[in-house]
Amino acid sequence: REEKLAAWEDFEPLCLHDSTLSFASHALFAARNGLMGQAGAYFRKALYLDLEDIMGNTGKEGLHLACLGEVWQTVVFGFAGLHFADGAPRLAPHLPEGCTGLNFQFFYRGKKYKANISGSCGTVLRVK
């Protein structure tokens, strides 16, 4: 983790963010590594990339669906902290400021699960 954070400190200020995937990628990394202020700022840019035409190309290129997919990944794998250990889904939530809870469903190894997060506590239940 220290190596990742050192690389972030060195290279994040140098990023041009000229790709529509840049903001979401940075949000995901920051959220997974506890950099919540930066995660929130990058998340908002990624979330509103098309709605506010942040890159100035939504009209020419249409919606940036890959960015929207990575926004979803930031919510689920970043803020909710969904990961898999010992053959089971686990949560390590750290929600952004202003967000008090989160619920979502997902499939893992052919089984359906529901994740419920309130504050810093989360549970994963198998849905039958």
Language-model segments: residues:
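C-terminal beta-sandwich/jelly-roll accessory domains of carbohydrate-active enzymes
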Residues: 121-128
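Alpha-solenoid helical repeat scaffolds
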Residues: 8-12, 44
